[in-house]
């Protein structure tokens, strides 16, 4: 159980770093920026909605303009990282 607690704390920090590294450039530090593609901002979306979209970009079932940009980003991330990222981004 102790390791589990540390894992959660690490995941939170890791998710913030993932967001900063992979998302902030287009979506802004607070997730409120509308990217050039005109899609809705991340800010204010639920973790479930964000995860569904991230998984859709990864498997090719979601996306419109700039789809290739997002596909290239999420292909680098594990399913666990996508979940952590969605959880973190939903708090913005």
What residue ranges belong to the model's regions?
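Electrostatic cytochrome c docking/interface patches
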Residues: 2-19, 33-34, 38
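Residue-level hotspots at or immediately adjacent to binding/recognition sites across diverse folds
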Residues: 11, 29, 67
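The canonical Cys-X-X-Cys-His
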Residues: 23-29, 85
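Conserved donor-nucleotide binding/catalytic region of nucleotide-linked donor-dependent transferases
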Residues: 62-65
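C-terminal capping alpha-helices of c-type cytochrome domains
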Residues: 72-92
């Amino acid at each position: 159980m102790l390791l589990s607690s540390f894992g959660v704390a690490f995941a939170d920090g890791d998710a913030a770093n993932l967001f900063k590294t992979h998302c902030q450039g287009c979506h802004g530090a607070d997730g409120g920026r509308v990217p050039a593609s005109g899609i809705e901002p991340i800010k204010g979306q639920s973790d479930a909605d964000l995860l569904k979209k991230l998984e859709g970009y990864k498997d090719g079932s979601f996306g419109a303009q700039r789809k290739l940009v997002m596909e290239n980003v999420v292909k680098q991330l594990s399913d666990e990282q996508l979940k952590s990222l969605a959880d973190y981004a939903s708090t913005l």
